[in-house]
Structures are given as C-alpha cells and as structure tokens.
Amino acid sequence: MKRFALLVLCALALLGACSSKKPAGESYSANLSAYNHTEDYIHQFYVDGAGGGNSRPYGGGGSFVCCISSPAQWRPGLSATVKWTTSSGIPGDKRPEAITPRWHEKVVPIDRYDVPGGLMNVHFLPNNEVRLVLSNMRASAKNYPGPASPVKPPDWKW
C-alpha cells in the first residue's frame, strides 16, 4: 500500500510539473542575427551572454543563432549588454592594431517594439555604435524598423 501511495504521489507531482506554464506573455525567444555596417571583421559577439557568431565587413543577416529571451512588452530603459571582438577586415593589413582582435562592450537600448519578433537583429555601426532591433523582419524588408542592410562602399575591394 505504501508503494502504491508513493507511486500516486510521484505521478501527481509529475503531472503538476507538466501542466505548470509561464504566465502568458511574460517573455519570448528570438534568434540573433548580425548586420555589420563597418569595414572591421567581427570575430564573435554576445548579447546578454548569448553567443551570436561572426560577421564579415559590410555583411550579415544571412544566418541566425538561437536564442535570446526578450520581454513580451517593451518598456523604457529596456537594454542589453553587447560584447564583441573586431579586427581589420582588410586582407593583408599587417599593422599590429589591425591583426590583434579588440574587445568592445556596451549597454545598448533595445528599439521600441509593439509586438515581440523572432529576430534580435544586431546592427554594428561605425564608431562602435550598436543598435538592437527586435522584429520578425530582416533588414532587407521594405518596412523594417531599423537600419537597412549594410552596403559595401563603391571603393571596397574585398
């Protein structure tokens, strides 16, 4: 009888664990995607500790890395810590400062959103500026709320 009672208690505990849910609308997962608007090569980047891979100069948006959690509702002051390493993206640049990766870190505000999207688009801009756009669209989409996809300058040879 004790065994049966113990079995029933375990089964009830498991059922209770399976049925418990997070409150609706608490948070969403989004894939990370980088857009590099600079001539630097981005070796790696992280948003609140979630790794996002690398990005070539004036490139990005082609791959996604899972996942970062974001609140269902945007609020003033919502931000994330972005860390990344860069070096020169110009082939053959042998200057010590060009070949030694440099770490950068910034607390970056997340652009306002009405509906949380499935993509956290991380835009690396000139002068070590970063913009975070949570959207269901890529930067190439017509009504994308952030910066357009990076464009290589006409004199960029690589």
Which stretches of residues belong to each language-model region?
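Bacterial lipoprotein signal-peptidase II cleavage site
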Residues: S19-E26
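Beta-strand-rich cores of mature extracytoplasmic or soluble domains
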Residues: W84-W158
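A short, structured loop/turn motif at beta-sheet edges
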Residues: T38-E39, A72-S79, R112-V115
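C-terminal motif of bacterial Sec signal peptides marking the signal peptidase cleavage site
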Residues: A13-A17
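Short structural boundary motif marking the start of a folded domain
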Residues: E26-L32
